[in-house]
Curated annotation (Swiss-Prot):
Residues 8-36 have a biased composition (Basic residues). This is Inactive polyglycylase TTLL10. It comes from the Eukaryota. It holds the Pfam family TTL. Transmembrane segments: none annotated. Residues 52-62, 612-627 have a biased composition (Pro residues). ATP binds at Q362, R363, Y364, I365, K375, D377. Residues 1-132, 569-673 are annotated as: Disordered. GO terms for cellular component: cytosol. One of its GO terms (molecular function) is ATP binding. Coiled coil: none annotated. It comes from Homo sapiens. Residues 155-552 form the TTL domain. Residues 89-105, 661-673 have a biased composition (Basic and acidic residues).
């Protein structure tokens, strides 16, 4: 038998149905047909599809698709009932014909129709009147294997919002940029993804340098009770070891510990977290014990006495759920018996992940500063706008008050917890809800009128002493977690920080919360929250764009109310497989370094010009160019394949990846006592 003959296997029955749907992780069958080679310009039949009643001719013999996909081409305006028109190309300063990337700055730009391949890469974040892609760009994408988004016929860029927390503000902001919202959480062709609850799928499919993703993967180092406690303890141990080095920097800084007043201590200029005094954990964080560790649990049960009140909180809860006070031995004994019974339960040992949530007990501050007899705390914001390099900001928030008068011995949690969820349980909430939230200006006026002369406070104490103290505490917490935080270009986070002031005007950090509440159910919140969200997104987009291009971060044109705490351009540079290395971000020299080898291309002297980086210390992998989110004040758009004028012969897209992010699922904002 001749085995060289080709054998054909025929299937019986009707032919296999061609599915037009999209299966995740695989290309649709309708897109696997051979592409027609395009030479010169794109045929008019591709740019001007024939009406549905008069099907047009096939673009090339032998490649005429059949079925619904041919009758309604993917990505064409025919599906949306729009008239197909050729794109209007725009010419930049270099004569390059391409899409308009300066829509927000060019008022004269003429908008074009949705393009066939406009979703190949997200458009400019500030582009509200962007023109459609030119024919030359479409041809280049076709020859290069570009294809439209298999999910939608609209051009994009796309954004996804998971949950309702701040969704209206975020959606309005993105739509004002010309972005379009998607509602499928499984899609990975987004430019911005903002979710209340973290999902490992989001981090697994995240494309560094191409997308923006809200919440750092391991922000639990700061935003859970146990995470924050462990982070601060680790920082304290490191500082203790450093202080024992004779003549060390920390040893000299520890000499300032006996300073009588914190406001008299020196503090460096904003933007560089190099405090001249090391904070001690016990100075701003209440004494706390972990109940999931036996030795800490037993230590707490031993030291407890009825002269102090303690508060027990789950490590990652929200809305005050699971919080209760410990005032007497009976309540502590009940808690001790419950923890022991759970520890002895064999089911808990077999499936510890199904056990109850870990808890902490924290010394309750019994002497809070009162406002008209009511307890209050201050919500401020820590913004991580960029992680490569780190750009950290402080933002003012508002004051939250209880409706009930403060009584330390009361069993009503509404008089102890200031969050809106607890206050809504009061029957008087709808009548007095405007009294549960104060602006920082209102709080400053009250403290100045009530305590300024009587207590000898500084003028405008809220905006001077309190502001500086909160910035110092935030800086300390960030520096403690910084070596362990996952950093990739495109990660950003907005963290809510809750501070309590006691009657001695000492400031305490209660907790830090992921996914802070962005609701606007009060007039003060309607004034504060939108500004916080809008400036957050503005700073995220600007720092992302500058980091991608390798430009200097400062000045930041979108910075308004947020205060810069840390500019990480001098920090260790991220590398493959980790969050930091010994490399630093390349300096910004005023003249080119001498070299014995062949001369290197000279970068023009303009803002953002940088010297080519030295050879990498670790193997690097190329990264595809991300979305061009620039605006007109940052320079003209570059042609595909060209270099940025401010980066020498090194393209900013060739940055190393900082490694794989840890994946987890967290609950939204924690409760705030």
């Amino acid at each position: 038998m001749d085995h060289s003959c080709t054998r054909f296997i025929h299937r019986r029955g009707p032919p296999t149905r061609t599915r037009a749907g999209f299966k995740r992780g695989k290309r649709p069958r309708i897109q696997q047909r051979p592409r027609a080679r395009v030479s010169g310009t794109i045929p008019a039949s591709r740019l001007h599809p024939a009406p549905a009643s008069q099907p047009g001719p096939c673009p090339a013999p032998g490649h005429c698709p059949v079925g619904p996909a041919h009758e309604r081409p993917m990505g064409s305006s025919q599906e949306e009932g729009l008239r197909c028109q050729p794109s209007q190309p725009d010419h930049d300063a270099d004569g390059h014909c391409g899409p308009d990337l300066e829509g927000a700055e060019r008022a004269s730009a003429t908008p074009g129709p949705p393009g066939l391949l406009n979703s190949h890469r997200p458009a400019d974040s500030d582009d509200t009147n962007a023109a459609g892609p030119s024919a030359a760009l479409l041809e280049g994408l076709l020859l290069g294997g570009g294809k439209p988004s298999p999910h939608s016929t609209r051009p994009g860029p796309f954004f996804y919002i998971g949950g309702s927390n701040g969704a209206t503000i975020i959606s309005s902001y993105c739509k004002s940029k010309g972005w379009q919202r998607i509602h499928d959480s499984r899609r990975d062709d987004y430019t911005l993804k903002w979710c209340e609850v973290k999902s490992r799928d989001s981090y697994g499919s995240f494309r560094e340098g191409e997308q923006l993703l809200y919440q750092l993967p391991n922000n639990k180092l700061l935003t859970t009770k146990i995470g924050l406690l462990s982070t601060l303890r680790g920082r304290a141990r490191a500082m203790s070891k450093a202080s024992k080095v004779p003549g060390g920097v920390q040893a000299r800084l520890e000499k300032d510990a006996a300073a009588p007043a914190l406001e008299d201590l020196p503090w460096t200029s904003p933007g560089y977290l190099r405090p001249q005094r090391v904070l001690r954990m016990e100075e701003f964080f209440p004494e706390t014990y972990r109940l999931d560790l036996k030795h800490e649990r037993e230590a707490f049960f031993t030291l407890f006495d009825e002269t102090q009140i303690w508060i027990c909180k789950p490590t990652a809860s929200n809305q005050g759920k699971g919080i209760f006070l410990l005032r007497n031995q009976e309540e502590v004994a009940a808690l001790q018996a419950k923890t022991r019974s759970m520890e002895d339960d064999p089911i808990h040992h077999k499936t510890p992940f199904r056990g109850p949530q870990a808890r902490v007990v924290q010394r309750y501050i019994q002497n809070p500063l009162l406002v008209d007899g009511r307890k209050f705390d201050v919500r401020s914001y820590l913004l991580i706008a960029c992680t490569t390099p780190y750009m950290i900001f402080f933002g003012h928030g508002y004051a939250r008050l209880t409706l009930s008068l403060y009584d330390p011995h009361s069993s009503d949690l509404g008089g102890h917890l200031t969050n809106q969820f607890m206050q809504k349980k009061s029957p008087l909430y709808m009548l007095l809800k405007e009294h549960t939230v104060w602006s920082m200006e209102h709080l400053n006026r009250y403290i100045s009128d009530t305590f300024w002369k009587a207590r000898g406070l500084a003028k405008d104490w809220v905006f001077t002493t309190l502001k500086k103290r909160m910035q110092q505490i935030m800086a300390h917490c960030f520096l403690a977690a910084k070596p362990k935080l996952d950093c990739k270009l495109g990660y950003f986070d907005l963290i809510g920080c809750d501070f309590l002031i006691d009657d001695n005007f000492k400031v305490w950090l209660l907790e830090m919360n992921s996914n802070p509440a962005l609701h606007t159910n009060c007039e003060v919140l309607k004034e504060v929250i939108p500004g916080v969200v809008i400036e957050t997104l503005d700073l995220v987009l600007e720092t992302f764009r500058k980091s991608l291009r390798g430009q200097k971060m400062l000045p930041l044109l979108s910075q308004r109310r947020f205060v810069l705490l840390h500019n990480g351009e001098a920090d260790p540079r991220p590398h493959l497989g980790g969050s930091c290395s010994l490399r630093r971000w390349p300096p910004l020299p005023t003249r080119q370094a001498k070299s014995s080898g062949p001369p290197m291309p000279h970068a023009p002297d303009q803002p953002g010009a940088r010297r080519p980086a030295p050879p990498p210390l670790v193997p690097q992998r190329p990264r595809p160019p991300g979305p061009d989110l620039d605006s007109a004040h940052d320079g003209e758009p570059q042609a595909p394949g060209t270099e940025q004028s401010g980066t020498g012969n090194r393209h900013p897209a060739q940055e190393p990846s900082p490694g794989t992010a840890k994946e987890e699922r967290e609950e939204p904002e924690n409760a705030r006592p």
